[in-house]
Design a protein with these regions (language model features):
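Bacterial N-terminal signal peptides that target proteins for export
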Residues: 1-8
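Hydrophobic h-region of N-terminal signal peptides that target proteins for export
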Residues: 9-19
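Low-complexity, Ser/Thr/Pro/Gly-rich disordered linker/stalk regions
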Residues: 21-99
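Secretory/extracellular carbohydrate-interaction modules
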Residues: 70-142
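Flexible glycan-contacting loops in extracellular carbohydrate-active proteins
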Residues: 189-220
Length: 225
């Protein structure tokens, strides 16, 4: 799996992001903010430049899990949730309703550092309710395109009412990082392709939740072993 990191890619992604935002604006969730003890969040740079913050979304505890009503795309984390060496982190994501006319991704990130800065590092794997998966990240705030958005039979497709559930996990070993959706590896990334100069500092670090904009989710079973 080839890692792509270049200004051309970043520009292309930025253009795509701007086009998507023009088609569908980030919503502003009433009564927004983070009320889960210990948790933090940060919106993507494009949203931040528009004056948006995590207070335009809502993260709260509900039913033993995290209830998320997302406006701008963002990452959410608890600084005490860290993983080092060889590990597995996983969580179950239930998209409770569709807040737009096309699927938006959500999933887990690992290797997080400097998350509350303008130069975050992290690697994330996300699923779409249309049956696709994608692996991407940030290195010092710059986009790391690891694998393209591709269909995978392991990724559940949304029902007619828009609801869908996905279990998403990262399994990190000495030489690679695997993303699993519903128990099946959808991407296997050699560490040499994602760790080093101009890439991630490490797969060690904070783990947490990555969400696109305008999604409603219940997240349960966020665990590490």
């Amino acid at each position: 799996m080839r890692l792509i990191q270049a200004s051309v890619v970043a520009v292309a992604l930025a253009v795509c992001s701007v086009s998507a935002q023009q088609m569908e604006a980030d919503r502003k969730v009433a009564g927004g903010g983070i009320t889960v003890k210990g948790w933090q969040g940060k919106v993507d740079a494009a949203a931040a430049k528009q004056g948006k913050t995590v207070n335009d979304s809502k993260l709260m505890e509900m039913g033993g899990g995290l209830h998320m009503q997302v406006g701008p795309a963002a990452v959410y984390w608890n600084p005490s949730n860290t993983a080092t060496g060889e590990y597995t982190v996983k969580a179950t994501f239930k998209e409770t309703k569709v807040a737009s006319d096309h699927p938006h991704p959500y999933g887990l990130f690992i290797g997080g550092s400097k998350l509350d800065s303008e130069t975050p590092n992290l690697l994330y794997c996300v699923a779409y309710g249309s049956g696709e998966a994608l692996v991407r990240g940030f290195s010092e705030g710059k986009v790391l395109q690891v694998s393209k958005r591709v269909p995978n039979a392991a990724v559940n497709k949304a029902a007619a009412d828009g609801g869908v559930t996905q279990e998403i996990a990262w399994n990190v070993t000495a030489d690679k990082a695997d993303c699993l959706v519903n128990g099946t590896v959808v991407a296997s990334v050699p560490k040499a392709e994602i760790v080093g100069a101009g890439k991630l500092e490490s797969t060690d670090g904070v783990y947490g939740i990555r969400v696109s904009h305008n999604v409603d989710l219940m997240v349960t079973g966020l665990t590490k072993k």
